[in-house]
Amino acid sequence: MDLSCGTLLVNMHETSSGLLYDMSLLSDFCRERGMALIVDAVSAFIAEEIDMAALGADVVLTGSQKALACHPGISIMALSPRGQERVAENPEVCSYLSLKEALRNGERGQTPWTPAVNTLLEINARLRSIEARGIDAERAEIASRAKAVRDALTSTTLEMVPENPSNAVTALRCPASNAKAIIERAKTGYGMWLCPNGGALCDEVFRIGHIGAITEEDNDRLIDCLTSLSAEGLF
């Protein structure tokens, strides 16, 4: 295996399978080899603990539409001091995608190009809300929602796909290969929208999200729906 590369880009949480990767292991791997670490945390942000300094992460990426529960349209990038140094050392190859330009404008509290302004205001309000409440409380609520759903399914035939699932989503395997029927019945019979999987696993796996603007009452309704689907013999 050629390990002469200088950067590792990793998806912290795999949304199609629900798997949460071992970031400590990947962090150690990069440190031992002097590699930069870029973390795609689009669906892991807020749902999982992400300490850039502890991980030695140079870049962390996320988006507005997942756990932030804002409208889509804005990508968010956090750079460590070392990450900013690497940006400064590299030549600009595209004006519209220039991180140098973004950092220069950030010093004056601006973006280089007009952003999705409404979404930016939403993000500002959401982050202030999280700051006031505390990130630990926010993360604990997501984890609690995930645990409640998973506990409710322990006596059914559904199987968890990953051994190390993220708080953000629960991916479930259907032994009867009737994922589409489960999704359709949940939607038409109970007004609950479950997430299908694509490709070869479209009949075998479906997913349940735990991030976003989900209330305790929403989660209780979801659990009632799943309990009813099980009683109907769908799993």
Q: Could you tell me what each predicted segment is?
A:
Residues 65-148:
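Active-site C-terminal subdomain of aminotransferase-like
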Residues 53-65:
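Conserved active-site segment immediately N-terminal to the catalytic lysine
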Residues 159-189:
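Conserved PLP-binding catalytic core of the aspartate aminotransferase-like
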Residues 1-46:
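Active-site phosphate-binding strand-loop segment of PLP-dependent enzymes
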Residues 157-160, 192-197:
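A short linear hydrophobic-aromatic micro-motif
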Residues 200, 204-235:
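PLP-dependent enzyme catalytic core of the Aspartate aminotransferase-like
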